[in-house]
Amino acid sequence: MASTHESISCITFEFAADVSALVHMHASALGDQCPPVRIGFDDLTAAYRFVPCSQPQYTVFCVWKPAVGTAPGGPAFYYVPGHNFGMAAAVLNFNRFPKLMVAMARSTLALPVDQYFDDYMVVDLASAGQSGQDGLSFLHRLAARPLDKDKHQCMSAANEGLGVTIDVSAVHTDGKLIVRCRWHRCATVLFMLREARDANFLPPGTASTIHGKLGFILSAAYGRVGKAASQPLVQRMWRDTDYCFTPELHHMLEFFEALLPELPALTIDVGPSRHAGPPVIVYTDASFSAPLVNGERKRVAELGYHVVVPRQGHPPRMLYQSVRLDDEALRAFSSTALTLIMQCEIAAATWVYYSAPDLFRCQRVIHFIDNTGALSALLHGYARKLECARMVNAFHLLAAALQLRVYFEWVPSMANVADLPSRSPEKGAMSAYHAMFPSAVPGPSFLPPLGSWLPGGALSLKAVFAQYGSWVASSVSYS
């Protein structure tokens, strides 16, 4: 099987954000307000057909035409100019032409333009009008490779391209660029999943198609919310031997039926950063034991957090809290398992954000955890155990609702200061904590019942929407 040693790098909607951020930066350096920005798209006409290849003799093919009535049969020859779709080298060779045109437009016209295969994205000042696209079109006419007039999208405050709607209308006022996924893409994914559910059959090929479509959709959602829920598709693609619609797939479908119609737009901050100050520091920990009580194992867990909130010109504010989970509460994870520490660590890491949503809203956070399993699940957005995956879904859903940017980091257990609040019933634990942090005060605590953490998908998702309000910052309306 032939392969190539070259590859290409495609742009995303982030190109528009990069240009917008540069406009903001240079306007600020000049002491001016940011001017309005506009975005437009163009497309090459019959792209693969207009770019020649070095072996045109191989683009001729022959089929046998059967005799019909009095018309004689015989060979019929067809010539396909340019590049053939499906050939490994065709993409690489074709891509050289639009790359060349982008380089020409940038160097001769100072035009902020880039390309995604045969699609061009132009991001320019509103005061420039259509001049950027006119210049790009002129260069293509010089190269005898015209742009497609039917696919031309004039410079505007919002346009559809690369599978999403890119809105730059708030760049100069609020320093924000908004990206929304097209609804028909969401509807297609839901339709395919419902068909598989009704047939109780999801083969690996279909799972791969759905997974690819979901990846594209979620790339334009805040924090790629919902990524965790798509992991049953990966399991089906590579490991499952039974192709029935499993409980994990049912849970995934319920999640996306609630999420996709309410999919949060991606808001990219391109102005002077709201997050210029230091981040909030979070430590969470959990302890778990199953002592014998009257000859019966009684499981119990204690969750703890330690939060450092920076204050400009003042010492940071320190908050701590703990909450106890008895055997009855832990039955939401398992009724028999004697080791539930990973589940409790994930619960602790999510509980801190449920407890103080207004404190964390729109903040950068550095979150320290000493359990590598919980850390991996929260970082990568998936856990193989269903109850862990549900909590990870809940965390990422909450992070999107609060517009959080969380950086997870491992910390050795002996250095995790949340270890003491998570062992608050033990003698001397809190005395040692207050000796280290005399200014720390109790923080809020709210832990939803573990059994309600997305057990049925849509119902509890809507409860999260209701509790935490709009998906997006209140200062900008994207409806």
Spans of model-derived segments:
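C-terminal reverse transcriptase regions that engage the nucleic-acid substrate
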Residues: 156-272, 419
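Active-site palm subdomain of RNA-directed nucleic acid polymerases
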Residues: 91-139, 352-369
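A short, polar/acidic, helix/strand-boundary loop motif
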Residues: 72-100, 308-347, 373, 382
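RNase H-like nuclease fold core
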Residues: 274-341, 355
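RNase H catalytic domain
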Residues: 114, 124, 354-418, 423
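Catalytic palm active-site di-aspartate
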Residues: 1, 41-45, 84-86, 108-127, ...
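Catalytic palm subdomain of template-directed nucleic-acid polymerases
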Residues: 2-6, 50-53, 111-145, 165-174, ...
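Catalytic-core region of right-hand nucleic acid polymerases
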Residues: 1-92, 179, 183-234
